[in-house]
UniProtKB/Swiss-Prot annotation:
Transmembrane segments: none
Catalytic activity: tRNA(Pro) + L-proline + ATP = L-prolyl-tRNA(Pro) + AMP + diphosphate
Protein name: Proline--tRNA ligase
SUPFAM superfamilies linked to this entry: C-terminal domain of ProRS, Class II aaRS ABD-related, Class II aaRS and biotin synthetases
Assembly and interaction partners: Homodimer.
GO MF entries: ATP binding; proline-tRNA ligase activity
Source organism of the structure: Mesomycoplasma hyopneumoniae (strain 7448) (Mycoplasma hyopneumoniae)
Amino acid sequence: MKKPEKITSRTADFAKWYVDVITQADLMNYGPIKGTIYFKPLGYKIWENIVKIVNAYFVKQKIENVYFPLLIPQDFIEKEKKHIEGFAPELLTITKVGDKNLVENIYIRPTSELLFADYFKAEIAKNNILPIKLNQWSQVLRWEKTTNPFLRNTEFLWQEGHTIHASKVEANQFAKKIARFYKYFLENYLAIPVISGQKTEREKFAGAVNTYTVEAMMQNFRALQSATAHFLGQNFAKNFEIFYKNKENKSQIPFQTSWGLSTRLIGAIVMVHSDDNGLIFPPKIAPIQVDILEFFSKKNQEVKIFAKRIAKILKNAKIAYKIDDTDQQIGYKINNSEVHGAPIRIEIGPNEVKNNQICLVRRDNHQKFFFNIDLLKEKCRKILEQIQADLFKKAKIRLLENTVFVNSINEFEQAIKNNKFVIAPFSESPEREQEIQEKTGATARCILPKNSFFALPQAGNSIFSGEKTNKFVLFAKSY
């Protein structure tokens, strides 16, 4: 098989490999402004599949979709200076319209907590019904210093959910529930194993009491924060003077959550699963699950007829497919299919037609299968399930083999130098985290829960102070 010439190998230059894959596989083109991209049809279809799956869960949870303004007024910003401080370097500000200066600045949303707080205040004053559970699919803008397509864009697509509750416990538990769903979604649909936990004080979302995160390992052993859920407490409710009447008709301040995932998951799919030939899609999220390649169909119409037969079977089985009926050479068609990442390709030529036979090739390991067309539906479903399971297993092994426990700062520094995920007993200050980042480039990804799939000891000695602690923190270099 001829290797695509335009894709750099992962070992030679991982960053270049990533860009080569997403461009050659037609996921995106660079936009005219730094940090923006044109989503091409294949790239946007991945997002549509994500939206479809996640929305189905939201419906079950009675979370309703809304759409809120892109623009935030200055007085909202003044109310939440602490929250906005975290976004200040990235905040896009409108100061002028035409040739006229605005009396007050207008801000383009980096996130929508302020708008949802304002909305909740009006709705509760009107109806006094809690909880309210909402979500919006939208775009936000953040003027990032360093950009990377899908992983860190100036403008990106996401879902941001917001809820408001009468009870502190109910709100916090709901944030945790959403974080568990994100873990389930990444592992069961994207075949990406994750480490879940709570962010440290330094790393948590600005304005949150607690932030719950799911962290994934890329093939270059960097961490990617893949989704987060925040328990906001009463922080926004107090500043926006949100009140509800309890059963005793007394005014109480409610509790909020916010949570989201974004198009950076497209980058995660690429970085976790793909190879030097191009994309590899997990079947459950793949825009095209089966690529049907016609060979010599211009000279042999029976090949076209056979391809349509296959397509009909796949359509009835609700398996997404595409037919390549171009007159390109065989090698080109195979390479093109490899680059674009369909989990399965079916190669059809005169011999397959003559023998009423299917030639099926797995994208992930290039294993070939030959069988009668009557077995297509059964075989396809079984092989797609196996690919999904194998991709997850491969990524899980990578995660486990490259995550280490350390008990001293020397062990810590060596492990980070070796590009490992590092779990360490740690009960230090945010300033100490800053020191670690400056010295090693690693950040605290999350505090591991006691029920983590890692066998955590009951306690350990914090790697800096030596004090006894039952807190174990995951550190890694990250995107």
